[in-house]
Structures are given as C-alpha cells and as structure tokens.
Amino acid sequence: MPRSQKNDNFIDKTFTIIADILLRIVPTSQREREAFTYYRDGMSAQAEGEYAEALQNYYEAMRLEIDPYDRSYILYNIGLIHTSNGEHAKALEYYFQALERNPSLPQAFNNVAVICHYRGEQAIQQQDIESSKAWFNQAAEYWKQAIQLAPGNYIEAQNWLKITGRI
C-alpha cells in the first residue's frame, strides 16, 4: 500500500484526495501518475523524518518522471534531505541539477547560498579569511538570484546583504 494511503493527519489526507481528483481530471499517462505517487510518498516520508524511505521514493519518481520541471522539484527535495543529513556537497549537486531544469526555483538558490554562507563561517573558524570571503561572495550571488525571483522572501538574506555591503 502506498504511503499516501496510510496518512493519518487531516492535511495529508486532504492533499491526497485533491491530488487523486486532479490525476483523474487532468489527462496523464500511467507513468506520470506512478511518478507522482512516488513523489507524494517521498514528501510524506520526508515530512516524517524517514529520509531513507523518502530517497527511495524520490529515486523511483526520478526513474519515471520525464518532465524537467517536475524533475526539478524531485531533485530539490533530494537536496533537502542531503542538507538535513549534513551532506552539503551532495546537496549542492542536487540543487544545481534542479536549477538546470528549473532556473526559477528561488528556494534552491537560497539553499545553495545558505550552504555557501555556512562554509564561509567554517573558513572563519579555521582562520582562512580569503576562503571565507570567497564563500560569502558566492552566498551573496545566490541570495541575489533568490531575491530577484522572490522579492518578498529571504528578508534575513536581504539584511545580511545590506549589512555586509553586498547589495
């Protein structure tokens, strides 16, 4: 039984019902429906902190999904899991793959910026000032792209850019 049929909370059940209705109304292939089911199950597992299960579902969704836009969200969510697990290099790979398919994904730009900023902070702790400047400059560039796509979001990033003279 797919995970999406086991959901206990109201929001997940509502989302599942609406998604199922949309899948019946909108003309989609069996492959597209299967890909979406795996994606939805991946999101559900991810929300519950079941990252291994979520990754399995996302990888299966990637195998089935052919639409680049839809694939971008799957890749983005895989990146989120790797970020949560502290696997920043792997996360960056997935965020960049997501952005290749969908360059209008501000949350991916934001997450790349957050990782760059984190690496800048690490460089400061190691007293590597030149590397920290480079990481912070990269973070600034990615945050600028995120803000350009979603001007009302990322207020903390906007403040950081102003305070550090990068905007």
From Swiss-Prot:
Gene3D superfamilies: Tetratricopeptide repeat domain. InterPro entries: PSI_Ycf3_assembly, TPR-like_helical_dom_sf, TPR_rpt, Ycf3/AcsC/BcsC/TPR_MFPF. One of its GO terms (biological process) is photosynthesis. GO terms for cellular component: chloroplast thylakoid membrane. PROSITE patterns: TPR, TPR_REGION. The keyword Membrane applies. Keywords: Chloroplast, Membrane, Photosynthesis, Plastid, Repeat, Thylakoid, TPR repeat. TPR repeats lie at residues 35-68, 72-105, 120-153. It is found in: Plastid, Chloroplast thylakoid membrane. Pfam families: TPR_1. NCBIfam families: PRK02603.1 (NF002725). Essential for the assembly of the photosystem I (PSI) complex. May act as a chaperone-like factor to guide the assembly of the PSI subunits. This is Photosystem I assembly protein Ycf3. It comes from Chara vulgaris (Common stonewort).
